[in-house]
């Protein structure tokens, strides 16, 4: 009898019949159909009606780098332009750790108490290595994030300079078309030269800390000369006296700049996001400037 190894069909491996392995895919699984892409008309209709879900989707399209998304978003923006331009745009900037996000949380609630609708566009820095972004600003706005008539949209800077994202202007237009009458643009923690947000907003608020510099900071041409107002944050506890000294120093530094074309004289105000003092005074300064 010829040995089976001499057969041409012999593979050198013998597999005994056993239990068949179950399929890795559940046969009873029902696949959810993909969402249909909304048309431009549906996007515009939803935005104008104040649908924040559709507004978020539209902002995502605007921020996308895909050519097909850019073409659709351009049409959406063009059709939303007639509904925009009716808000107070406030840019909020400052050094990292100055308390911008926490201040916006308290400041935003004050705006909502007056019956307004608030949109916050928070720009978060992107990693130069991984290109990713934590988008953690919203987590610091605990009360505002669950408040009615408030919309918070974190966006990555994606390497854009100037403290804002590449499509911040377009996002502002969409928020205005959705009926938000007050818009905060929170920049990344900026230095003295990143002032792109100034050209996008009506009022540019700079949040500073005590001990961050003396009058020499006022001489340095940069972000301070663009500010319409300075809020010296963390004026609480043992920091109150230092905050008052800083207020006087910044107020003196502001006089070193040429006067604004509008005749407005920038002011320095002390406030505390923790104790919630000085917030009405900051908003009063904004209203006086806008009027």
Predicted regions mapped to residue ranges:
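Generic beta-sheet signal
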Residues: 121, 207, 232-233, 271
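Canonical P-loop GTPase G-domain recognition
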Residues: 229, 235-290
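Nucleotide-state-sensitive switch-loop elements of NTP-binding domains
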Residues: 39-50, 55-98, 102-193, 198-207, ...
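Short beta-strand/turn micro-motifs at beta-sheet edges
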Residues: 139-140, 216-221, 256-260
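Flexible active-site lid/hinge loop adjacent to a nucleotide/diphosphate
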Residues: 212-241
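Long, basic/Gly/Ser/Thr-rich N-terminal segments
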Residues: 1-48
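Alpha-helical scaffold elements adjacent to nucleotide-binding pockets in ATP/GTP-utilizing enzyme cores
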Residues: 134, 171, 196, 200, ...
């Amino acid at each position: 009898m010829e040995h089976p190894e001499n057969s041409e069909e012999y593979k050198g491996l013998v597999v005994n019949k056993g239990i068949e392995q179950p399929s890795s895919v559940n046969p009873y699984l029902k696949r959810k159909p993909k969402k249909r892409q909304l048309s431009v008309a549906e996007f515009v209709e939803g935005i104008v009606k104040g649908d924040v879900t559709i507004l978020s989707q539209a902002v995502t399209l605007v921020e996308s780098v895909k050519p097909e998304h850019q073409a659709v978003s351009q049409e959406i923006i063009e059709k939303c332009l007639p509904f925009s331009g009716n808000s107070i745009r406030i840019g909020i900037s400052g050094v990292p750790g100055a308390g911008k996000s926490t201040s916006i949380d308290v400041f935003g609630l004050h705006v909502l108490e007056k019956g307004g609708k608030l949109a916050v566009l928070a720009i978060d820095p992107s990693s130069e290595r991984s290109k990713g972004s934590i988008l953690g600003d919203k987590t610091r706005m605990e009360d505002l994030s669950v408040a009615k008539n408030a919309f918070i949209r974190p966006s990555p800077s994606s390497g854009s300079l100037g403290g804002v994202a590449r499509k911040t202007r377009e996002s502002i237009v969409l928020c205005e078309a959705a009926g938000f009458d007050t818009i905060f643009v929170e920049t990344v923690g900026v230095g003295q030269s990143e002032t792109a947000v100034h050209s996008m907003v009506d009022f540019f608020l700079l949040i500073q800390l005590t001990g961050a510099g003396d009058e020499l900071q006022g001489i340095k041409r940069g972000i301070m000369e663009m500010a319409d107002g300075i809020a010296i944050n963390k004026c609480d506890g043992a920091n109150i006296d230092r905050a008052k000294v800083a207020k006087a120093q910044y107020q003196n530094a502001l006089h070193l700049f040429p006067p604004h074309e509008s005749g407005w004289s920038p002011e320095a105000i002390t406030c505390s996001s923790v104790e919630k003092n000085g917030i009405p005074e900051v908003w009063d300064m904004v209203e006086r400037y806008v009027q």
